[in-house]
């Protein structure tokens, strides 16, 4: 009976691996680009700006399309070009001047080889969930410390709070110290779990999307916090309240740490 169960489990794992293999085989045709030292920065910037662009378009249209305002957390606010351009400029500058040298050092110290086989689907999902939970925990601790210690707040985190009403391009409007800290959290978690390169790519896409959505200022019916049950995920309304009140909702994504420490505040309780 045990052998029969083990055989079924082996077939299930093999099938889930085959499910991802065509995608991985296709990505491997771009192996030279993926293994290039330029790829991490190129991938990060293009993914980030690609996710920001729809919200920028919505912000431009919002004054002319009143129906869009029903989805805005702050219906009367739309970022001006003088708010958007500094955010875009800072993101590009920091990625070129600071992030690229760091990724170059990591590329030289830890060369990556693309394995021939894709990860099992269950393993990929498990690692992505663990990466998100670890990042959420690390940033929660970092975030609370930077709000409780005035010097840390002034030196590293104050810049991110210059825009009290969030918008997508303000997601990475932060000091270089904060940006690099978030990058280190990502890198450590991926190395700790020994994630497959495909898992790493998908995790980064999900993480960038969730962070942009958190700052977008739009609460849609399909927003992440409406899709995750039981109030486990805070989402855009949760994080927007942090930007307006400062002393609550420190976790970027999930709600458990704020619940445990008594810093969770509902957007409905404003």
Curated annotation (Swiss-Prot):
Its main location: endoplasmic reticulum. Belongs to the sterol desaturase family. It catalyses: cholesterol + AH2 + O2 = 25-hydroxycholesterol + A + H2O; cholesterol + NADPH + O2 + H(+) = 25-hydroxycholesterol + NADP(+) + H2O. The chain crosses the membrane at residues 38-58, 81-103, 127-147, 167-187, 190-210. A motif (Histidine box-2) lies at residues 157-161. N-glycosylated. Glycans are attached at residues 5, 163. It is found in: Endoplasmic reticulum membrane. This is Cholesterol 25-hydroxylase. Disulfide bonds: none annotated. Residues 128-263 form the Fatty acid hydroxylase domain. Keywords: Endoplasmic reticulum, Glycoprotein, Iron, Lipid biosynthesis, Lipid metabolism, Membrane, Metal-binding, Monooxygenase, Oxidoreductase, Steroid biosynthesis, Steroid metabolism, Sterol biosynthesis, Sterol metabolism, Transmembrane, Transmembrane helix. Its EC number is 1.14.99.38. A motif (Histidine box-1) lies at residues 142-146. It holds the Pfam family FA_hydroxylase. GO terms for biological process: B cell chemotaxis; cholesterol metabolic process; negative regulation of fusion of virus membrane with host plasma membrane; response to type I interferon; sterol biosynthetic process. One of its GO terms (cellular component) is endoplasmic reticulum membrane. GO terms for molecular function: C-4 methylsterol oxidase activity; cholesterol 25-hydroxylase activity; iron ion binding; steroid hydroxylase activity. It is a multi-pass membrane protein. A motif (Histidine box-3) lies at residues 238-244. Catalyzes the formation of 25-hydroxycholesterol from cholesterol, leading to repress cholesterol biosynthetic enzymes. Plays a key role in cell positioning and movement in lymphoid tissues: 25-hydroxycholesterol is an intermediate in biosynthesis of 7-alpha,25-dihydroxycholesterol (7-alpha,25-OHC), an oxysterol that acts as a ligand for the G protein-coupled receptor GPR183/EBI2, a chemotactic receptor for a number of lymphoid cells. InterPro entries: Fatty_acid_hydroxylase, Sterol_Desaturase_Related. Its cofactor is Fe cation.
